[in-house]
Amino acid sequence: MRQNYDDRKIVKQYREIARQIVKKEGLYKNMDQAELCEQTNFWREKFKTKPMTDRDKINIFALAREAASRIIGLDAVVVQLIGALVLGDGKVAEMKTGEGKTLMSLFVMFIEVMRGNRVHLVTANEYLARRDREEIGQVLEYLGVSVALNESGLDIAQKKAIYTADVIYGTASEFGFDYLRDNMVRQKEDKVQSGLDFVLIDEADSILIDEARTPLLISDRKEEDLSLYHTANKLVKKMMKDDYEMEEHKRFVWLNDAGIEKAQKFWGVESLYSAEAQSELRITMLLMRAHFLMHKDKDYVVLDDEVLIIDPHTGRALPGRRFNDGLHQAIEAKEGVEVKEESRTLATITIQNYFRMYKKISGMTGTAKTEEEEFRQIYNMDVVVIPTNLRVNREDMQDDIFYTKKEKGRAIVYEVSWRYEKGQPTLIGTSSIKSNEWISGLLDAAGIPHQVLNAKNHAQEAEIIAKAGKRGMVTLATNMAGRGTDIKLDPDVHKLGGLAVIGTERHESRRIDLQLMGRSGRRGDPGFSKFMISLEDDLLEQFESKSWEKLSTKLKRKAPRDGKPVNSRKIHAVVVDAQKRLEGANYDIRKDLLSYDEVIDLQRKMVYKERDLLLERNKLGVSSEKILREVAEYSFIHPSDIPEEELEIYYSRQKELLGGTKFPISFDQVTLMDPREVVEEIVSWHKKERNKFPAETIAAIEREVYLNLMDQMWVMHLDAMVQLREGIHLRAYGQQDPLVMYQKEGAQLFEKFQADYHFYFAHALLELDPDGLIQG
């Protein structure tokens, strides 16, 4: 993207500082490593008591620049230093691919460590984390800064050691899972994360936007009748188009009146929306999503009788990841493979809410300006476009738009064939495995040798990408495979025009198109890019616009069938409009997810805060007597004029509180006593029993029981919130705002959760026996 006025203003301001940093290159030239480490210690100590000035920044950057020159032989150029200064302001730096973002990260991490902050560097995958830790980590270590790599599969002791480092490399999911696991421990000493000071996110658009739709989940197996999925599959397979309504771009499908009647008859229920039919309704809706919204070889792939999710932004399969809330099981039933047990959520957080907990956040990527509004609204981060060190030498052509996919396919083969014959390497980008395999078949038929990269063979990704810049190589890849790694050109390829990039479809986001184009023309290399699309592509087929429907029908009817592109201004404008609308719809989905998660987020923070206090104090924050009194009063004291059916609820609660406990008065006697007298008897008896225990022992027992019950009830509450979330959109058709209803009913469920674990804690207190154990 081009710089706007604000970007130019910021860059101009920082260019002068960057030039001063370069001028300081002689300052540390004659110092040995020990002296450079002394400088590091000097700056660390200084900023414990004093603020950092621009002059300090210049000297610190110059120190890091000297170390990088010595250790990895790279001298940071002015634009890299400008980018690092932008990152230091808590912004997103958009820097073209191949311009040296990895080296840029060194400076902002080093300066944040000097400020006394612990730094987390987040990358898209463990391979990149390991690679960058080795390259930049050695420079930081040379300067006396400790560096660690946060990997999955480590034990608590190893994790604790990692989190003592000044700079920690890792993936978003691993840092997020560590946070969730920390809030499931039973002892304070088992927590590993030590403060969320500063996070620098590489490929920020991918992590903060693309991955934001998928929450992080820790789960275990959930008991469920899996045969219902196969049964519901039979129903959905028989459904006709007039049984349901669908908004595919919003990923939403629902039964209309005809469909409801058919489903009720199939399940043998009077009402599909009755409490008794909740499981049948839920699983029917899941199977409808699986059949009508989830597409094989686009959203998922079936390999070795297993359903694997396809990352929509990279085209990679994600082994070990499953769609949550029963959708994965529904797809398994649809595809006729083994339906595996659904997981039950133990802890969850969205990427957005995890990273918003850091005191300071910065990001770097090759493409972010198109999503600046989202970065601002959700993360409070501006995006600044950093100029390139060398002029971009890539030729970006206008799209060729064809009437049909068949015509498009022929044109792509022709375009690739003449480039192949002259030896120019070509990268062909597709948006799905299906499209990838279709183009591959056309190339095979034309006798053009090529290598294929998609979710089915992504294990060979590094090897395939390494060959993509070789003379005469044709590479066919889904989306952004190989992102984060360079396609290096053979020396003789430059005179042939560099790497040619052919896009076969416009993606859901202009940003992903720009990423594909950005594979070519790196660091001043020559290059070429062009999109070859058709009126039958998903983007235009699903575009809902009356004027476009009329124009599309007219164009297809009058198509000359000569295989030439349409290429009218009007159609190019439609493509841009369709893409912008889809971007807006996807942004709304992410905002929607965040709005719903903010309800859980507030509840989660309250629960985790109480947990932390329990672990810190090693005893309850309030007296057990106070909790018992409140529960007893809630159970026994009620208005004298309450209806008979509500009175039954009170009796039931009283029986549950006292049933199976050591309380010496029988329930028959209790019913004859004054309710306030019962409360006092319960409290005084518990007090007497409690005093039989040593103070430390009883405090430890109460804390353990309270913590255990809170954790158990929290898991049940999360499950209830999932069920509420799944059904809440049905309210939209009852003239009620589903989000408002979710907030209201979610708050009621949270109050119930708190009341429940207090109730069962009170019950447990009455089960204390003289040996100091909790029975039952």
Swiss-Prot record:
Keyword match rRNA-binding: no
Entry's localization field: Cell membrane; Cytoplasm
UniProt keyword Transport present: yes
One MF term in the entry's GO annotations: ATP binding
GO cellular component, one term: plasma membrane
Biological processes annotated in GO: intracellular protein transmembrane transport; protein import; protein targeting; protein transport by the Sec complex
Organism, as annotated: Listeria monocytogenes serotype 4b (strain F2365)
Gene3D superfamilies, A to Z: Helical scaffold and wing domains of SecA (1.10.3060.10), P-loop containing nucleotide triphosphate hydrolases (3.40.50.300), SecA, preprotein cross-linking domain (3.90.1440.10)
Keywords: ATP-binding, Cell membrane, Cytoplasm, Membrane, Nucleotide-binding, Protein transport, Translocase, Translocation, Transport
Assembly description: Monomer and homodimer. Part of the essential Sec protein translocation apparatus which comprises SecA, SecYEG and auxiliary proteins SecDF. Other proteins may also be involved.
Membrane topology, from the record: Peripheral membrane protein
Protein name: Protein translocase subunit SecA 2
SMART domains recorded: SecA_DEAD (SM00957), SecA_PP_bind (SM00958)
Functional summary from the UniProt entry: Part of the Sec protein translocase complex. Interacts with the SecYEG preprotein conducting channel. Has a central role in coupling the hydrolysis of ATP to the transfer of proteins into and across the cell membrane, serving as an ATP-driven molecular motor driving the stepwise translocation of polypeptide chains across the membrane.
Pfam families listed in its UniProt record: P-loop_SecA, SecA_DEAD, SecA_PP_bind, SecA_SW
Broad EC category: translocase
Swiss-Prot/TrEMBL catalytic activity: ATP + H2O + cellular proteinSide 1 = ADP + phosphate + cellular proteinSide 2
CDD domains in alphabetical order: DEXDc_SecA (cd17928), SF2_C_secA (cd18803)
SUPFAM superfamilies in alphabetical order: Helical scaffold and wing domains of SecA, P-loop containing nucleoside triphosphate hydrolases, Pre-protein crosslinking domain of SecA
Chief location: membrane
Residues annotated as binding ATP: Q80, G98, E99, G100, K101, T102, D486
Family as reported in the entry's similarity comment: Belongs to the SecA family.
Entry EC no(s): 7.4.2.8
Domain of life: Bacteria
InterPro entries, A to Z: Helicase_ATP-bd, Helicase_C-like, P-loop_NTPase, SecA, SecA_DEAD, SecA_motor_DEAD, SecA_preprotein_X-link_dom, SecA_SF2_C
